[in-house]
Regions:
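Short non-domain terminal segments
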Residues: 8, 30, 41-44, 79, ...
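Short linear sequence motifs
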Residues: 3, 19, 36-39, 74, ...
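Secondary-structure boundary/capping motif
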Residues: 12-14, 38-40, 62
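Mixed-charge, Lys/Arg-enriched low-complexity segments
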Residues: 49-95
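Weak global preference for isoleucine
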Residues: 13, 19, 28-31, 41, ...
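Negatively charged, low-complexity tracts enriched in Asp/Glu with abundant Ser/Thr
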Residues: 1-25
């Protein structure tokens, strides 16, 4: 496990791909959940608030398909997903 992008009590953010759109940002992260001792993929939504820029919002991420494609492409380029995952995804799409 490499150096964390960010660390909280809950997890370490190992890798992150994020797209900014005015006062919000959305992304995909590879995280290490401390209590479960496992890596997971997390879809995230951030909003600028008075307290801080890009505060994590605890809600589902809703995106138009075009934005999801952009985010998936960026996540693949920034190695958020493992090569094994990308290969399996490619196999599904090739069927």
């Amino acid at each position: 496990m490499g150096k964390a992008v960010k660390e909280t009590r809950y997890c370490k953010v190992l890798r992150q791909a994020k797209i900014r759109d005015n006062d919000v940002a959305y992304g995909i992260e590879k995280i290490f959940v401390k209590d479960l001792n496992q890596e997971e993929i997390r879809f995230v939504y951030f909003k600028d608030t008075i307290r801080m820029e890009e505060q994590l919002v605890a809600r589902p991420l809703d995106l138009p398909e075009d934005d999801l494609i952009r985010l998936m492409e960026l996540s693949i380029k920034q190695n958020v997903f493992s090569k094994e995952f990308v290969g399996k995804l490619k196999d599904i799409l090739d069927k």
